[in-house]
C-alpha cells in the first residue's frame, strides 16, 4: 500500500498583458494559472510556455517575457491546472 501523499503546490491566477505588439491578429492579455509571477510572465497566451526564446518570431505577443506585465488576481482552486485559463485575441 502506497501511503505517500503528493502535495500539489499552491497555484495563483495572474492577469498578463502586453502593449508592444498591437493591432489585428495579436493577443493583448490573458488569465493564466501559475506557481509564480515569473512563471506567469513566461506563459504565452497561445499556450507556449518556456524561456521566451521561441517568442522572437512569434508576432502575436510580446517579443520576450520582460515585455509582459503581470498582476496577481487571486489563488487558484485546487482542481485548476497550470496554464492559460482564457486569452484575448484581437482577430483581424
Segments the model singles out, each with a brief description of its role:
Residues 1:
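Glycine- and charge-rich intrinsically disordered segments
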Residues 4-25:
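Short aromatic-glycine-(Arg/Gly/Cys) micro-motifs in beta-strand/loop hairpins
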Residues 6-8, 33-40:
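A short, structured loop/turn motif at beta-sheet edges
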Residues 17, 35, 71-73:
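A structural detector for beta-sheet-dominated domains
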Residues 22-27, 90-92:
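His-enriched metal-coordination microenvironments in redox/metal-binding proteins
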Residues 25-35:
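A short, exposed loop/beta-hairpin motif centered on an aromatic-Gly-Thr core
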Residues 46-92:
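Short, mixed-charge low-complexity intrinsically disordered segments
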Amino acid at each position: 500500500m502506497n501511503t505517500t501523499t503528493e502535495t500539489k503546490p499552491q497555484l495563483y491566477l495572474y492577469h498578463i498583458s502586453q502593449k508592444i505588439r498591437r493591432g489585428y491578429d495579436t493577443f493583448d492579455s490573458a488569465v493564466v494559472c501559475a506557481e509564480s509571477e515569473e512563471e506567469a510572465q513566461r506563459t504565452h497566451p497561445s499556450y507556449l510556455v518556456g524561456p521566451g526564446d521561441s517568442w522572437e518570431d512569434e508576432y502575436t505577443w510580446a517579443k520576450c517575457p520582460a515585455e509582459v506585465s503581470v498582476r496577481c488576481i487571486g489563488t487558484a482552486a485546487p482542481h485548476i491546472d497550470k496554464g492559460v485559463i482564457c486569452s484575448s485575441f484581437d482577430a483581424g
